[in-house]
Amino acid sequence: MPKYTLPTRDALLKAMQVGETSIEAAEYMATRFEQILTKAKLLPECNDMLEKIKEYAQFVKFKLLSSAQVWSGQERPTSDYQNTQENKAEFLASHLEGLPSGLKLEVAIGDDAKILRGFSSNGKMVEGDQLKTMDGLLEGWLAKNSLAISGGAVVKIDNTGNQTKVDPQEIRQLINDSEKGVAKYFADKGVGMEVAQRTYQEPKALETKREEIRQEIESGAEAPTTQSIR
């Protein structure tokens, strides 16, 4: 019975480079690698590497989403900030025709309260007016919790429009709160939204992450051979 070698280190590294070009390429890379391991019945032995590849693909996806979807929020340091944003959210919620299914928000809060976010629908980037709608609703959620975006970071805002720093851990916990969280707010507006928090990464983190996985790959042994899995 013919034998085939699973992807070599060089092949995996090249696949990672290709996977950085688009969300679809990143997801395909991870999915294809898992399929190969499954068919070869080598999933248990290579599961650690698979998890690394999946982590990298997810990281690339979030980076591409957050960099392509420039935050569209407007700073409104006024006394009626909450009312303005809530009215805007209500208006957007009443005009949801044609909204795609499988919506997902991936969000990361840095230790300095910097925020990155990306919206997708069934793995594809949300764009145009639909992105504006999603951002508008997210701004409504922030305002409802006396929060706003200033200089790319989340800040507290009071009734007079004064801004103060906020504990990033409080924001992270609030995002996932069952009663006050983002998913609940979107659901109340009639929008099903999966919410996933990611680790905040600085702009050069992709290169760092790539180097970490490259070292993991190069420090390991070549994958064993197995029967044909084509």
UniProtKB/Swiss-Prot annotation:
Gene knockout outcome: Deletion of the gene leads to a reduced intracellular growth in the protozoa A.castellanii and decreased levels of effector translocation. Deletion of dotY results in the absence of both DotY and DotZ proteins in the coupling complex. Deletion mutant shows significantly reduced DotL polar localization.
Annotated compartments: Cytoplasm
Pfam family, one: DotY
A Gene Ontology term for the protein's cellular component: cytoplasm
Chief place of localization: cytoplasm
Source superkingdom: Bacteria
GO biological process: protein transport
Disordered: annotated span: 202-230
UniProt feature, compositional bias: Basic and acidic residues: 204-217
Keywords: Cytoplasm, Protein transport, Transport, Virulence
Functional summary from the UniProt entry: Component of the Dot/Icm type IVB secretion system (T4BSS), which is used to inject bacterial effector proteins into eukaryotic host cells. Part of a subcomplex which recruits effector proteins and delivers them to the core transmembrane subcomplex. DotY and DotZ play a role in effector translocation, but are not essential and do not influence the stability of the subcomplex main components. The DotY/DotZ main function is to optimize secretion by modulating the delivery trajectory of the IcmSW module and the localization of the machinery to the poles.
Subunit structure: The T4BSS is a complex nanomachine composed of several subcomplexes. This subunit is part of the Type IV Coupling Complex (T4CC), a subcomplex composed of the DotLMNYZ core and the IcmSW-LvgA adapter subunits, linked by the C-terminal tail of DotL. Six DotLMNYZ hetero-pentameric units may assemble into a hexameric nanomachine, forming an inner membrane channel for effectors to pass through. Interacts exclusively with DotZ. DotY and DotZ are co-dependent for the assembly into the T4CC.
Protein name: Type 4 apparatus protein DotY
Organism: Legionella pneumophila subsp. pneumophila (strain Philadelphia 1 / ATCC 33152 / DSM 7513)
Gene transcribed to yield this protein: dotY
